Curated annotation (Swiss-Prot):
Biased composition annotated in UniProt, kind: Low complexity: 334-345
Keyword Metal-binding: no
Transmembrane segments: 68-91, 105-130, 143-164, 185-206, 230-252, 492-514, 527-546
MF annotations from Gene Ontology: acetylcholine binding; G protein-coupled acetylcholine receptor activity
UniProt organism field: Pan troglodytes
Residues in the Extracellular compartment per record: 1-67, 131-142, 207-229, 515-526
Keyword annotations: Cell membrane, Disulfide bond, Endoplasmic reticulum, G-protein coupled receptor, Glycoprotein, Membrane, Phosphoprotein, Postsynaptic cell membrane, Receptor, Synapse, Transducer, Transmembrane, Transmembrane helix
Role of this protein: The muscarinic acetylcholine receptor mediates various cellular responses, including inhibition of adenylate cyclase, breakdown of phosphoinositides and modulation of potassium channels through the action of G proteins. Primary transducing effect is Pi turnover.
Modified-residue entries (Phosphoserine), positions: S385
Protein name (Swiss-Prot/TrEMBL): Muscarinic acetylcholine receptor M3
Gene from which this protein is expressed: CHRM3
Quaternary structure, from the entry: Homodimer; the dimers can form tetramers. Interacts with NALCN. Interacts with TMEM147.
Membrane topology: Multi-pass membrane protein
Residues that carry a glycan: N6, N15, N41, N48
Family: Belongs to the G-protein coupled receptor 1 family. Muscarinic acetylcholine receptor subfamily. CHRM3 sub-subfamily.
């Protein structure tokens, strides 16, 4: 005579439904077992009774009180940190406009998935571990599994989207960034969630209806179609190993591209310093004259430097020898020198900008110098090579074209009666804007045709050169800022990817081992591995804070409740500025 408990026992005091059994074998007990009620060591506090299906109704699942306290405390802290951290991410995105970038939209989606895991998955799985059985019924079990797997797979899909976004942003900055809008980011995020839902939710919720029966035993909770190790192995390959492989390859490409751009920027800065030194006009003695030989030597130096860098430079050389009446006119030679340098500087800036946009075409820069007597337009336009220069023969008076195909000679009269033979090397400059010379000369015969530029004075050419160097420095600064942003984004991606691999790998390794040896891994290891996957949701907000200063300062502001103080300080500052303005207004009126 023995006793077995009803399956619907209370958690603390079970409702005992006694039945008398005439033999020990009827109860599944070994022979010789005393089948007297008093022979059982019944603990009313623990309620250790076995149901016919073999499940245990012990609310502590065979754990001691201290074990339960430790498990509940540790998992509770992790769940709380996960919830708070991801709520901080969502609220920070809401309150700080600086965080509303396309890249952070993906992080926002990832934070939503992590928040679901922290609120639902962690707590239910902890209850399952402590009680050592599922006590909430089949429907709650299937809903929990569906939410858990959809949110976890959405995290993986979001990481994939972030990796591809970073990769295309760095490798295709011109074409991809034009299409990289918040609307497109929302579409990508929506697709990640829809794909995750379609892959897991219907199969988990309705598989028992597809096959006609439910094979999950009472008191247990797992996905029915994953009961076969081979199916579990296949899902592990598709849900973890393939995404991790793709993300690792993409991150490696991102790292190599970032390193290459860093070297290019260093070379650009070095060439910029060298060009600035070479382009500086050094007066020699009492004259600033410069012969065509010196200009050709300078061009050869620049062409040699061109071979060692990725930035391609095209230079123009204009020189002339002053006539006997103009030997004392010091500014003529300096005009030639500075005109050469100004055009060269413009080409430098155009070439560096070409590297910035990552295009094979030449960026267009036009610098218009409106001078008292004339205006000069220097254009750097799209030309695939420097051999396509076409200059009208009527304007430049082409001489000896067959023998010297790389030089064009022309003569142009100016109002003081002097003439300047000009020699032009092959240029990537298409002279298409007529020079306005109405105030200065009688060269009206060139109306409607392209013409060569007039020589600039020393002061004017210096201004043009300074402007070109400033443009170059601005381009370099923009490239540096863009590179810094890309590095920060790559650091955030690397931290998230590393955390994902560390936390998800142990469980998926056990899945592979279980395919060949289903009894080699203890249940405790399974629980730890599964919980470690949840910890990834705890670590992600920490990665954002460590790698992004804006996130870090916003987190601090929210945790210290400084939002209202910041608004008040801003309002007080605006009020002070308004008072100062009103005080100064009467004084200025006087």
């Amino acid at each position: 005579m023995t006793l077995h408990s009803n399956s619907t026992t209370s958690s603390l005091f079970p409702n005992i439904s006694s039945s008398w059994i005439h033999s020990p074998s009827d109860a599944g007990l070994p022979p010789g077992t005393v089948t007297h009620f008093g022979s059982y060591n019944v603990s009313r506090a623990a309620g250790n009774f076995s149901s016919p299906d073999g499940t245990t109704d012990d609310p502590l699942g065979g754990h001691t009180v201290w074990q339960v306290v430790f498990i509940a405390f540790l998992t509770g802290i992790l769940a709380l940190v996960t919830i708070i951290g991801n709520i901080l991410v969502i609220v920070s995105f809401k309150v700080n406009k600086q965080l509303k970038t396309v890249n952070n939209y993906f992080l926002l989606s990832l934070a939503c998935a992590d928040l679901i895991i922290g609120v639902i998955s962690m707590n239910l799985f902890t209850t399952y571990i402590i009680m050592n059985r599922w006590a909430l019924g089949n429907l709650a079990c299937d809903l929990w599994l569906a939410i858990d797997y959809v949110a976890s797979n959405a995290s993986v899909m979001n990481l994939l989207v972030i990796s591809f976004d970073r990769y295309f942003s760095i490798t295709r900055p011109l074409t991809y960034r034009a299409k990289r809008t918040t609307k497109r980011a929302g579409v990508m995020i929506g697709l990640a969630w829809v794909i995750s839902f379609v892959l897991w939710a219907p199969a988990i919720l309705f598989w028992q209806y597809f096959v006609g029966k439910r094979t999950v035993p009472p008191g247990e909770c797992f996905i029915q179609f994953l009961s076969e190790p081979t199916i579990t192995f296949g899902t592990a390959i598709a849900a973890f190993y393939m995404p991790v492989t793709i993300m690792t390859i993409l991150y490696w490409r991102i790292y190599k591209e970032t390193e290459k751009r860093t070297k290019e920027l260093a070379g650009l800065q070095a060439s910029g310093t060298e060009a600035e030194t070479e382009n500086f006009v050094h007066p020699t003695g009492s004259s600033r004259s410069c012969s065509s030989y010196e200009l050709q030597q300078q061009s050869m130096k620049r062409s040699n430097r061109r071979k060692y860098g990725r930035c391609h430079f095209w230079f123009t050389t204009k020189s002339w020898k002053p006539s006997s009446e103009q030997m004392d006119q010091d500014h003529s030679s300096s005009d030639s020198w500075n005109n050469n340098d100004a055009a060269a500087s413009l080409e430098n800036s155009a070439s560096s900008d070409e590297e910035d946009i990552g295009s094979e075409t030449r960026a267009i820069y036009s610098i218009v110098l409106k001078l008292p007597g004339h205006s000069t337009i220097l254009n750097s336009t799209k030309l695939p090579s420097s051999d396509n220069l076409q200059v009208p023969e009527e304007e430049l008076g082409m001489v000896d074209l067959e023998r010297k195909a790389d030089k064009l000679q022309a003569q142009k009269s100016v109002d003081d009666g002097g003439s300047f033979p000009k020699s032009f090397s092959k240029l990537p400059i298409q002279l298409e804007s007529a020079v306005d010379t109405a105030k200065t000369s009688d060269v009206n015969s060139s109306v409607g045709k392209s013409t060569a530029t007039l020589p600039l004075s020393f002061k004017e050419a210096t201004l043009a050169k300074r402007f070109a160097l400033k443009t170059r420095s601005q381009i370099t600064k923009r490239k540096r800022m863009s590179l810094v942003k890309e590095k920060k984004a790559a650091q955030t991606l690397s931290a998230i990817l590393l955390a994902f691999i560390i936390t998800w790998t142990p469980y998926n390794i056990m899945v592979l081992v279980n395919t060949f040896c289903d009894s080699c891994i203890p249940k405790t290891f399974w629980n730890l591995g599964y919980w470690l996957c949840y910890i990834n949701s705890t670590v992600n907000p920490v990665c954002y804070a460590l790698c992004n200063k804006t996130f870090r300062t916003t987190f601090k502001m929210l945790l210290l409740c400084q939002c209202d103080k910041k608004k008040r300080r801003k309002q007080q500052y605006q009020z002070r500025q308004s008072v100062i303005f009103h005080k100064r207004a009467p004084e200025q009126a006087l």
